[in-house]
Amino acid sequence: MNPAIVVDDLTRTYGELVAVDGVSFEVSPGEIVGLIGPNGAGKTTLLECLEGLRTPSGGSVRVLDVDPAHPTPAWRTRIGVQLQTAALPPKIKVREAMSLFASLYDHPADTDELLEELGIAAKRDAYVEKLSGGQRQRVFIALALINRPELVFLDELTTALDPQARLAMWDVVRSIREGGATVLMTTHDMDEAEALCDRVGVVDHGRLIVLDTVPNLVASLGGGAEIRLRTSSPVPDSVLDGLEGVSDVSVRGCRVRLRSTSTRFPQRIIDAIERTGPTVSDVRVSAPDLEDVFLTLTGRSMREED
C-alpha cells in the first residue's frame, strides 16, 4: 500500500522569508501523525502545501498519489480539512451548514448521524453564533468529515478550548482513525500529541527536526529526570553548570529547570544553590516528556513564541 503522504525536500518561501525549509517525511495509511512547534514554526504553511492551498516553492509532495498543486475534483473529495481559522455566517443554523456542504458531494455522510457521532445533534437547529467554542469546533470537524475523507488535516484543533472540550475533541480524533482515515495534525499541546499520535514531528524555524514515536523521542534523551524548582533570588548559571550529571540548565529569573541523570540528585542540587545564598522551594521531579524533547532539540521551551 502506498503512503498516504510523501513529502520530499519541500520548501516554501516568501521573498527572503523561508517558511518551510527542506522538509521530508512520509505518513502511512491509518496513522495519526502530529507536528508540534510554536507559532511561526511553519506548521500551518506546511499543511496548506499538502492541502493544495499553497504552491510549494521547491521539492515535491504527493498526497493520496496526487500532487496537491494540481488537484483533481476526485482528489478533493478524498481529503477533509479543518483550518486553523474558519468561520461561518453567524445566522446560519448548524443543519443548514451541514446540508450546504453535503450538497457539494455525490456521496456525503448522513448529516444527522454525523452530528450524533460528534455529540452536537441537539444543536442542529441552533445558530452558529450561539454555539460555544467547543461546539463550533465540532461543527467544523463535521463539515470536514461530511465527504467521508480518507485523509484528514487538523490544524490546531483544540486551541482556546477549555479542558473538558479539549478532551472531548481528542475522542473525536480517535473516532476518525477508528473509521479508517489517516490524520495529519498540528498542535501546541504536548499532552495532546502524546495522547493521540502514533508519531510526532518537531518543527522549528521551518524545519522538521525529527519525526518518531513518542517513546523513541523520549528515550533519545537518555533517561534521567527533569527537575524544576524556584529560588528566592536569581541563581547564576555557573552554580549549576559544573555539577556532575546535570545538563540542559535553563534559568529564567527565579525559576530553574534542568535535566539530571538520576532522580536522586535533587538534594545535591538544592544544597549547591543554597550555599550561594538563595533558598529553594517548589521542587518538582518528573520523567522526561515531549516538552523536554522540544527543549533539547530547539534550545527553547514550547511556550517561548516566535
Task: List each language-model region with its residue ranges.
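Hydrophobic/anchoring residues in structured secondary elements
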Residues: 37, 248-251, 285
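ABC-family P-loop ATPase nucleotide-binding domain
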Residues: 1-11, 300-306
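ABC transporter nucleotide-binding domain
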Residues: 169-261
